[in-house]
Amino acid sequence: MRFSVVETFHGHRGRLGNICGLRIGTGEQCLDTPTCLLYTQAGSAPHLTRDMLHKLGDVENLPALFPLPPITSFVDSVMQFGKGLGSFVALQSHPSFIRIQDPMVTTPSGFNDKAGVSVWDQGGRVHLNPLSFTRMMEAFQPTCYQALCDSDTPQDASRKRLQRAVDRSVSLLDQCLAMKADSSCLQHSAILGSVQGGYNRDFREISAKETAKRDVDGFVIEGFHVNGPQTKSLKFEEVAEILEEVIALLPQDKPRFLHGVLRPEFILKAVLYGIDIFDASLAHAATEAGCALVFNCSSDKDLELMLGRDLLDQELEMDMKNARHREDFVPLLESCACYACTNFTRAYIHHLLNTGEMLGQVLLSLHNIHHFLGFLKSIRKFMVQHGAKELNGN
């Protein structure tokens, strides 16, 4: 996996970039950044078949995020299958990225130790050490995976907990790197190191410097939250200063990831601070809540508004279970060209959700993913246009 910076911008660490060498099967793909990873659960985009997913157009080759917890239960089957995770779940056209925890599920606290990290699948707790984890990765053969790390650092974490998270994450990374180097199955898989330290600048600096010394292909900024839909309440201003300091310590020639159910204004500001890749879990969180994403993001003026203030909840999403939509015979979003908006009304989707019909969540998923991907496309366009203005001194 090779990352190159296409353009940087005066006054910001934000950049347009390109990732090449993303291995899928015997071929390779490239990816423009900033962007996001398609969110999956148990190997599929929730509520959507592959054919329905690909009706979204630009999504066909979008890299997919596979949270580790819901896929640990079928690792033996994937191993016997012998062709890797992407082919096993019929998403072989999507580069596969494996993350240790699920951004949609709150991570229980207090279950990591110096030997390894705990995740939770349908059967309960699974404790992973570097050896068992590497064997899983050999079965899954991902395009890219996050090394084991201890990200159990809620906002009220003690200095002792932060110290352990930093020390353990570096130790686990070293072990994962050594085992990857000895594995013939993982020679073409990229590996990501994680920057820990919670909200403590000293620990963040130690973690960033130590992780940057390792031979990793990119960096995941971890430890600002413990995952789950409640992450949406995190304000960018709470992490801005620490994030800026961390980014300054990381090399320019490697991508930076930040995962979680993050609001659009958080994502936009994080891009300007130098984050390259997010995930689309916000779209899934909205669907699970019975909501349609409706925030305006198609114009420069819309994005400038996000930089100036936080969106109101009613500006972000619309509750489609609300009775006021019973006779609302317009699309979810008038300007949207997705399958749901071009064929169905708010009234019908409201009816589907309130009668428990699966089609309701299918249509919401199609709309929310389409809208979220359009948002990332608007950010790239915004950066191109405003970068040119800044570089020209206008």
Swiss-Prot record:
Tell me which GO cellular component terms the UniProt record holds: cytoplasm
Per UniProt, Zn(2+) binds at 336, 338, 341, 367
Keyword Metal-binding recorded:
yes
Cofactors: Zn(2+)
Which Pfam families has this protein been placed in?
A: TGT
Keywords assigned by UniProt, alphabetized: Cytoplasm, Metal-binding, tRNA processing, Zinc
Q: Which GO terms describe its biological process?
A: tRNA-guanine transglycosylation
Give the UniProt subcellular location, in the record's own words: Cytoplasm
Q: How is the cofactor bound?
A: Binds 1 zinc ion per subunit.
User: What is the predominant subcellular site recorded for this chain?
Assistant: cytoplasm
The entry lists its GO molecular-function terms as: metal ion binding; tRNA-guanosine(34) queuine transglycosylase activity
Quaternary structure (record): Heterodimer of a catalytic subunit and an accessory subunit.
Cited NCBIfam families: tgt_general (TIGR00449)
Family from the record: Belongs to the queuine tRNA-ribosyltransferase family. QTRT2 subfamily.
Q: What is its biological role?
A: Non-catalytic subunit of the queuine tRNA-ribosyltransferase (TGT) that catalyzes the base-exchange of a guanine (G) residue with queuine (Q) at position 34 (anticodon wobble position) in tRNAs with GU(N) anticodons (tRNA-Asp, -Asn, -His and -Tyr), resulting in the hypermodified nucleoside queuosine (7-(((4,5-cis-dihydroxy-2-cyclopenten-1-yl)amino)methyl)-7-deazaguanosine).
Protein name as catalogued: Queuine tRNA-ribosyltransferase accessory subunit 2
